[in-house]
Amino acid sequence: MEQYWGYHTMLDCRACDIESIKNHDNIYNFAKSLVNAIDMKAFGEPQIVHFGEGNKAGFTLVQLIETSNICAHFCNDTGDAYIDVFSCKPYDRDVVRDEIIKFFKPRQITVNYIERQA
């Protein structure tokens, strides 16, 4: 099997539980739990900041990991979430999906996955 430089999972999560995506502590706990669940090493604390206006407003999460990053944006109005996991260390995409379901309860998840190699 060819070894790739990186693995990138992009999850578009429709109609999450609104209260869960507007809750700073829930997003923080998600970041901590996901890092552990996919056996990564966090580099510092997650950065979670509320950004945007109108239908773009919501929390943005950035969690640096030793092998790259976990990023997410949560939309207050729709309950949608856009979550990316990028790492040069392989991880289980199903575990990522399970963690999202546990913390945000989306009605639907569309998963796109690419293996990165320059």
Spans of model-derived segments:
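Polybasic/polar functional segments that serve as interface/processing modules
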Residues: 1-118
